[in-house]
Amino acid sequence: MKVLSLIFVLFSVLVLFASAKDPVCDQPKAVGRCFAAFPKFYFNSSSGQCEAFIYGGCGGNENNFNTLEECNAKCA
């Protein structure tokens, strides 16, 4: 019975860690302070989806992905 309880606890911990979202995904959209126009994607924590935006090319934050697939893999 103790072994079964231990297995259950370990499984629960693994599920919690696997479902933990990367803190990058909670950062706001940041277009940057320059004036280029690069199409990028960010995770919108309000809508729970990755969305397109135009990145200025410098500054910003880590919630900035080159492809929709990359954004979804990290955050969705």
UniProtKB/Swiss-Prot annotation:
<dbReference type="GO" id="GO:0004867">
    <property type="term" value="F:serine-type endopeptidase inhibitor activity"/>
</dbReference>
<keyword id="KW-0964">Secreted</keyword>
<keyword id="KW-0646">Protease inhibitor</keyword>
<keyword id="KW-1203">Blood coagulation cascade inhibiting toxin</keyword>
<dbReference type="GO" id="GO:0005615">
    <property type="term" value="C:extracellular space"/>
</dbReference>
<keyword id="KW-0722">Serine protease inhibitor</keyword>
<comment type="function">
    <text>Potent anticoagulant protein that inhibits the hydrolytic activities of all serine proteases tested (trypsin, thrombin, elastase, and chymotrypsin), with the highest efficacy on thrombin.</text>
</comment>
<dbReference type="Pfam" id="PF00014">
    <property type="entry name" value="Kunitz_BPTI"/>
</dbReference>
<protein>
    <recommendedName>
        <fullName>Tabkunin 1</fullName>
    </recommendedName>
</protein>
<feature type="signal peptide">
    <location>
        <begin position="1"/>
        <end position="20"/>
    </location>
</feature>
<feature type="disulfide bond">
    <location>
        <begin position="25"/>
        <end position="75"/>
    </location>
</feature>
<keyword id="KW-0732">Signal</keyword>
<dbReference type="InterPro" id="IPR050098">
    <property type="entry name" value="TFPI/VKTCI-like"/>
</dbReference>
<keyword id="KW-1199">Hemostasis impairing toxin</keyword>
<dbReference type="InterPro" id="IPR036880">
    <property type="entry name" value="Kunitz_BPTI_sf"/>
</dbReference>
<keyword id="KW-0800">Toxin</keyword>
<feature type="disulfide bond">
    <location>
        <begin position="50"/>
        <end position="71"/>
    </location>
</feature>
<dbReference type="InterPro" id="IPR020901">
    <property type="entry name" value="Prtase_inh_Kunz-CS"/>
</dbReference>
<dbReference type="InterPro" id="IPR002223">
    <property type="entry name" value="Kunitz_BPTI"/>
</dbReference>
<dbReference type="GO" id="GO:0090729">
    <property type="term" value="F:toxin activity"/>
</dbReference>
<feature type="disulfide bond">
    <location>
        <begin position="34"/>
        <end position="58"/>
    </location>
</feature>
<feature type="domain" description="BPTI/Kunitz inhibitor">
    <location>
        <begin position="25"/>
        <end position="75"/>
    </location>
</feature>
<keyword id="KW-1015">Disulfide bond</keyword>
